[in-house]
Regions:
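Histidine-acidic metal/acid-base catalytic patches
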Residues: 1, 131-263
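Catalytic-core regions built around general acid/base machinery
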Residues: 19-30, 99-104, 165, 219-223
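N-terminal small/glycine-rich loop or linker at the start of catalytic domains
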Residues: 35-45, 80, 193-201
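Active-site acidic/histidine proton-transfer and metal-coordination neighborhood
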Residues: 28-30, 48-147, 157, 168, ...
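Hydrophobic faces of well-ordered beta-strands that scaffold small-molecule active sites
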Residues: 5-7, 34-39, 73-75, 111-113, ...
Length: 263
């Protein structure tokens, strides 16, 4: 039993704009909404014309989100290309986000920055994968239509503590990806060796049932409750079948009731 669906801008059917309102109607007929859009702009390319094209794509995704009835649209920093300095990357990404914000406001959309691992179609890992870089970028963009989509599992993939990250950014978290990850084989260090040179996620990486992995959801929800979080929590699970997804939903429902009894 869920309340909504997070949408993915890359669904093949979304290439036809006439489908957008149809999908919204179908979802709403089931008593649900589409609050969040998942998309992956690449704002760190050194070529200004490339970045301008990514801004244009992001604006289309913002309009897509609005048409579907959503209020949150993801942004990423971009790829961590060789030779790109932290200062350059932060500047490129912040500038692109700022150029998207007026249109986001016009459409009633909040842009949500995620500390990601690596988009499926990227060669290089996320530029702002590391906590210090992510926080530098976050500090550069201050706007009421901009916040954080917190995914605790991505911190593990950067060799970092998701709670340490949360304590630094909790006041700016507006949405969350609830997930649990595990390595099918090897170690985090083995994973890092595979970050560059292979498009998409390393094969040793897998999603797990929520509540069964490394994430401490009691600590996470305690902090989010403390800072007044009241946003959407999107479930990242289901790759191993609907039964596992149902167990993840049940786990999160119980935790939400525990920490937000008013819901």
């Amino acid at each position: 039993d869920i309340d909504g669906l997070e949408w993915y801008a890359g669904f093949i059917e979304m290439q036809d704009e006439s489908n957008w309102k149809k999908f919204r109607k179908q979802v709403e007929m089931h008593g649900k909404t589409i609050p969040m859009m998942c998309c992956s702009p690449d704002f760190t390319h050194p070529d200004p014309s490339f970045r301008l094209n990514e801004i244009t794509k992001q604006k289309k995704w913002i309009f897509m989100t609005s048409t579907l009835g959503g209020t949150y649209c993801r942004v990423l920093s971009g790829q961590r290309r060789p030779g790109l300095s932290v200062e350059e990357g932060v500047s490129f990404a912040a500038d692109c986000i700022y150029k998207c914000l007026p249109y986001a406001k016009e459409q009633g959309i909040t842009l949500i920055l995620e500390k990601h691992y690596k988009d499926d179609f990227w060669v290089y890992p996320e530029f702002a994968q590391k906590m210090d870089v992510f926080c530098k970028l976050l500090d550069k963009v201050n706007d009421e239509h901009f916040g954080v989509n917190y995914d605790p599992s991505n911190a593990f993939l950067a060799g970092e503590d998701p709670l340490e990250l949360l304590y630094k950014i909790s006041a700016r978290v507006v949405t969350m990806h609830a997930s649990d990850r595990y390595l099918k084989e090897g170690t985090i260090e083995d994973l890092r060796k595979e970050e560059v040179g292979a498009t998409g996620y390393a094969k040793r990486l897998a999603h797990g049932e929520i509540g069964k992995g490394l994430n401490n959801y009691d600590a996470i929800f305690t902090e989010l409750k403390k800072v007044g979080f009241n946003g959407w929590i999107s479930i990242e699970d289901g790759v191993d079948g609907l039964e596992q997804l149902e167990r993840s939903v049940s786990f999160l429902r119980k935790k939400i009731k525990q920490y937000w009894p008013e819901h």
